[in-house]
Amino acid sequence: GLNNVTARALAPIAQFIEPEIYSEIIINRPGVLQLEIHTGDWSTINLPELDQAVLEEFARTAANLVGQLYTPSNPIMTCKLPGGHRVQVVGGY
């Protein structure tokens, strides 16, 4: 399971991580999620609460989980979350 800090950082997208119907979640800009369903179909969801501050906090939390650093001078990070979800972050500092 996820610890409280990780669960809080993932809260805005948790509803899309839990169902096994999604094979990929892409966030290319704040407030917009793109979801790939296992059938290969894509959908876009507007999620205003997924703002820049929330995304940055998620990236820092994910990096900390695996002993990496995510900062303005190091804005690229790849890791796996507990549960095996792959995360790739390229920050827009």
Language-model features, listed with the residues they occupy:
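N-terminal accessory targeting/assembly segments
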Residues: G1-S73, T78-P82
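P-loop NTPase nucleotide-binding module
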Residues: H85
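Conserved hydrophobic/aromatic pocket- or pore-lining residues that grip, position, or stack substrates
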Residues: V89
